[in-house]
C-alpha cells in the first residue's frame, strides 16, 4: 500500500478545501492516489461541502419537538430563505430535532452525529447548512409557539395550556431576557444605574436628586427586560405578572430562539456589483 504523506494531505486540502482528517481518510481509501481521492470526494459531496463551509448561513428554521414534559428547540441554518422551505432541508432539521429530543444531545454531539448527512445535503442543495443551537425545557406544564419558522419559544410553569401559550406568544413578540425583575443580575443593574445617574447629572441635577430619580428609572428598566414586568401584549394595561396572578398561573423558565441571532450577514450586493461579478466570471 502506498504511503499517505503529509505533503499529499496538504495538497488535497488546498485543492478541495476539506478538513485534514477528511483528506487523510480519502487518500487512505484511494491508496494515496490524489486524483482518485478527489474524484471520490466529489462523488460523496465532501469537497463541495467544504467549499460551501465559508458561506454565511444566517437563514434557516427553528424546530420545536415536545414529549412527556420535555421540549427541544433546535436551530438549523442555511444561506437563503428559499432553501429553508425546501423539503430536504426541513426533513433533515426534523430528524435532528427528534434525535435531540430522544437523546438530549448537545449541539456539538448532534453536529458530529449528523455530519455525513449534512455533507450529503450540502452537495444536493448547494448551500452551506449548519446545526447551530439546541436548547431543552422541562416542566410539569409546557407550552410552545413558533412564529413562522423563524422564532421559537417554549415556556414552562404552572397553569392552563391557553394561558401558557399566550405567554409564549408574548415572549416571541417582546423578547424578555429574564422571568422576573429580581432575576436581573446585579452587575447588569449596577451598570445601568451608573449610566442613568450620569444621564441625570448631565441634565443638571445634583447627585442626591439624580440618585432618587434613578430609583424610578431602574424599576422601569428591570421591568422592561423581564417577562412578568412587561406590559402583556394582549392586554397592555396589565403586566404579564398581573395577568398570570389573575389566572392562577406562573412561569418558571422560558427559552426563545430566533434564526440568525448574532450571525453577521454578508452585505447584499447591488445589481451593478452582481453584473460586474458575472462579467469577471
From Swiss-Prot:
GO terms for cellular component: cytoplasm. Gene3D superfamilies: 1.10.286.20, DNA helicase RuvA subunit, C-terminal domain (1.10.8.10), Elongation factor Ts, dimerisation domain (3.30.479.20). It comes from the Bacteria. Residues 80-83 are annotated as: Involved in Mg(2+) ion dislocation from EF-Tu. Keywords: Cytoplasm, Elongation factor, Protein biosynthesis. It is found in: Cytoplasm. GO terms for molecular function: translation elongation factor activity. Associates with the EF-Tu.GDP complex and induces the exchange of GDP to GTP. It remains bound to the aminoacyl-tRNA.EF-Tu.GTP complex up to the GTP hydrolysis stage on the ribosome. Belongs to the EF-Ts family. PANTHER family: ELONGATION FACTOR TS, ELONGATION FACTOR TS, MITOCHONDRIAL. This is Elongation factor Ts. It comes from Vibrio campbellii (strain ATCC BAA-1116). The lineage of its organism: Bacteria, Pseudomonadati, Pseudomonadota, Gammaproteobacteria, Vibrionales.
